[in-house]
Each structure stands twice: as C-alpha cells, then as structure tokens.
C-alpha cells in the first residue's frame, strides 16, 4: 500500500478539488469517510468505513490522505466528507485556538461543545487511545547519554539536528511553543520532512531528534526512545470520530456504529496496527478487517 503521496502536488490538488462546489447528485444513500495524510489517520478512516459498510446498506466512499488538519476541517464543513478521525488536543489548539488543558475529560468536553455550537459537528466516543506528539531520539543515544526527559535533552540539543512534519512546525501547539517551553536550540534550523520518513531518518543518523507520535509502530522496531514531556507542554490527543450533525440526522444508525468503536483501540493496539502497515508493509484493508474481526465487530 502507498503509505502517503510522495509529491506535494497530489495533496494540494486534492485539497483544491475538495473545496470546489459539488456537481454530484445527492448522496443521501452514501457516506464519505475522510482521513489525514498519515498512516494512523488512514487506518482509523478505514476502520470506520469498514464498520459502516458492514452494518448498513450505505455505499461508503473513501477520501483519504487529505493533507492535514485544516484541509479535513474545511472538507467536512463544506460537506465534501461526512466523517473523519481527529484528535482532541489538535481540535482544541489548532482549530478552536484555545489554551491547552492537561485533563483528557476537560479537553474532550470543551471540543465536543464548541464543535456542536460553532460548526454543527458531533464528536463520537473516543477510540480508546491517546496519540500525543513524541520527541524521539535513538535508543543508543538515550542509554549512552543517560537522558529520559526533554528537559535533560536541552543540554545536548545544540549538537543535534532535528526533523519535524510541516504541520508541527506551523501549529500553535507545535515547534515554536515546544522550543520556548524547554529552551530548545538545535545545530541548525529543523528539517521539515514527511511524517513517514522521520523515524527512519533518525535511525539512519540523518537527524538526531524527530517529532513523531507515541503510537508510531516503528518506535520499538527501530529502537527509538521517546523523551518524556516533563513540563507537560502537550495536551491530551484522544483520537475521536468527527461527524456532521446533518449526516447523523439522515443516518442515525451511524451513531451506534461509532459508539461500538468507543474504547476499542488501546495505545498498544494502535501502535501494532501502525507497525503492521509501516513496518511489515501489509495491506491496510486486510489489517483493519482482521482487527475488527478479532474484536467481534464484523464477521
């Protein structure tokens, strides 16, 4: 499976197309599931798509790899997609522009209420895992330097090269705030890289610190070490489905489907799903189907 487009032109063209007025006939009999442009979001989108396809008579269209957070938000507001997976901390800071909170329940409640009020969007129950940003270094470096936290890493950062995804460099809860909180200064300006390339670039010594995610399946596989966010900079990033209120009104049965997915995926299970696709290069559709069957959610 192609994990993500290799050229920036593809997501840009998709993004433009997503925001154009629709010329298609009414899609009352179908649901459009979207995702962001990284493996975990794709997998969550595929999980919802397979569940809806298995439990309803609706046709399910997949519009995956829609660049980042802002494009997905615009797409769902424009009615070009009906549902996609989001993260509560991202919604709170990047979309709602609100200050972060360390309490998972508080973040969920604030996002749920504001999304309903401002956008007519409904948050379903959380999938069960929290995928926060992970500042990763090589395991060998963590052991050699005896460092476990971001605060400890600041002493070594001036000799390191860092790499981050584009969105992390631009977001209010991203690099600038992290650097200010910890006083981070690197050997050179951080490199902006595709999320799927960061872990291997770190392992191959092309960078020395990577901004990844805690459920990245390559962390244990490549012997990477996640530095503890000891100053609690990052808010909770609980994975949740976001769906249009109008879609739920037209297809109320989807609410039960999303409820059945609530709490079904642990941090470890999500990491294993990611690794099956990114590390073992397995077909994502098959990986998702096997997982749903193991949970008794589909036949």
What are these regions (language model features)?
Residues 59-74, 188-200:
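Short helix-initiation/N-cap motifs at beta->coil->alpha
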Residues 169, 173-184, 252-299:
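An extracytoplasmic/periplasmic, membrane-proximal ligand-sensing/linker region
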Residues 20-22:
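C-terminal motif of bacterial Sec signal peptides marking the signal peptidase cleavage site
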Residues 77-86, 158-160, 177, 202-212:
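Alpha-to-beta junction loops
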Residues 95-124, 204-206, 218-232:
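Ligand-binding "clamshell"
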